[in-house]
Amino acid sequence: MIRFRSDRLAAALLAACLAVPAFASAAEPAAPVVVVRDQWAQAAYVTPKAQREAALATLASQSEALIAARPRDPDALIWDGIVRSSLAGERGGLGALSLVKQARRDFEAAIALDDAALGGAAHTSLGALYYQVPGWPVGFGDDAKAREHLQRALAIDAGDIDANYFYGDFLRDQGDWAGAAAAFEKAIAAPARPGRDVADRGRRAEATRKLAEVRQHLASR
């Protein structure tokens, strides 16, 4: 059975984004997008694990309706992708593949409309998918594309908490322990985002935990 790594797919992301990555932008997203964004943070970081899949499945119905109403809104597309990625992480197995494929389509559509939307969140989330989803012939995983999208996200916003977190996680997977440590440190030091306390606290805790693991590995060499 294929098992998606739920701690990583839960934001994309991987973020997200996904994100799953949890993103902010200079211009506040439309109110319906903010509702999905904030409910995602609650589902990802507050809802108990046993109830998380059901909460995300309900939210996926809302985000699907959101993009039906706002098909050319990159922010809405990004958040639908993040919700689907997070749900895939909780669900796991072959059943998650259809969710991450739809998430990829969402992120690609958002990039085509505005690749800098939500501070490059579509690149962060798409990059996170590329290094966590299995490769061919099962899935579309591709480490080269993961690096490309994560670096593009950092070029758009070098201080973004999610872009740095997922880049650090990617580098850790690649065996670049020093690079991973530097990226996690940047994620932890990222400035707080207005109205994003829950997401910031959760992502910072994840980065702190991963940084401790990386430092332990570096110290043991």
Residues of each region from the PLM?
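Terminal, low-structured helical/coil segments at or just beyond the last alpha-helical repeat
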Residues: 183, 190-221
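N-terminal leader/linker segments that initiate helical-solenoid repeat arrays
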Residues: 24-62
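TPR alpha-solenoid repeat register
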Residues: 76, 120-122, 163, 197
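Short coil turns that delineate tetratricopeptide repeat
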Residues: 71, 115-117, 158
